[in-house]
Amino acid sequence: MTVQQRRRPPIASRETLQALLSEGAQALGVALSDAQRSALLDYVALLAKWNAVYNLTAIRDPRQMLIQHILDSLSIVPHLGAHGAAAAALDVGSGGGLPGVVLAIALPGWRVTLNDIVHKKSAFQNQAKAELKLGNLSVVTGRVETLRPGADVPAKFDVIVSRAFADLADFVTLARHLVAPGGSIWAMKGVRPDEEIGRLPDGARVKQMIRLTVPSLDAERHLIEVELDEAI
């Protein structure tokens, strides 16, 4: 056994992850059924399995995946409630399916579409859709600025969200044509992105900026909602 192997932390059991998820969801005010918790844990296992080959995330430890990916994604759920129980959402630059897969599990009445330009990531997303039996989840590969409502995607979206896609101004510029009337763009950010906000294009403005607290995560997190003149 090598020194590195001796120092490697033990892999958390499913029971440990389940307890962490239950406590975290409760702290966030997100109600999850047993089936939803099970699906989220299955997703962590799937992400860890495929990550070895597809390099979906720099995080390798399932416990940290649950904190930094699952709980982080769940933290935005309470703030999306204004869009109702049956909204349509687009996750841009979804990568390994974050936050879109988590939203599809936590909000089963929503129709969630994952978007990425990398085919191997879309392949994983489709695998997650199949294995987790997420009938409300769709996958579309391609650049977001080229997606056409009624052709590449069924229609415009009430919510367009991104977790780690681009500068806020670029995100808004590239995705604004896909926002439905009354809809908005939501960007998950780390530190407060004041400089990015200052570069927002004409017709776009911050509706609200929410400081998020993610259980077990010692990092600054913000959720920015941007509204557009043409979507009002």
Curated annotation (Swiss-Prot):
The keyword Methyltransferase applies. One of its GO terms (cellular component) is cytosol. It catalyses: guanosine(527) in 16S rRNA + S-adenosyl-L-methionine = N(7)-methylguanosine(527) in 16S rRNA + S-adenosyl-L-homocysteine. The keyword Transferase applies. Gene3D superfamilies: Vaccinia Virus protein VP39. Pfam families: GidB. It is found in: Cytoplasm. Its EC number is 2.1.1.170. S-adenosyl-L-methionine binds at residues 93, 98, 144-145, 163. It comes from the Bacteria. Keywords: Cytoplasm, Methyltransferase, rRNA processing, S-adenosyl-L-methionine, Transferase. GO terms for molecular function: rRNA (guanine-N7-)-methyltransferase activity. NCBIfam families: rsmG_gidB. Belongs to the methyltransferase superfamily. RNA methyltransferase RsmG family. PANTHER family: S-ADENOSYL-L-METHIONINE-DEPENDENT METHYLTRANSFERASES SUPERFAMILY PROTEIN (PTHR31760:SF0). Specifically methylates the N7 position of guanine in position 527 of 16S rRNA. This is Ribosomal RNA small subunit methyltransferase G. It comes from Burkholderia pseudomallei (strain 1106a).
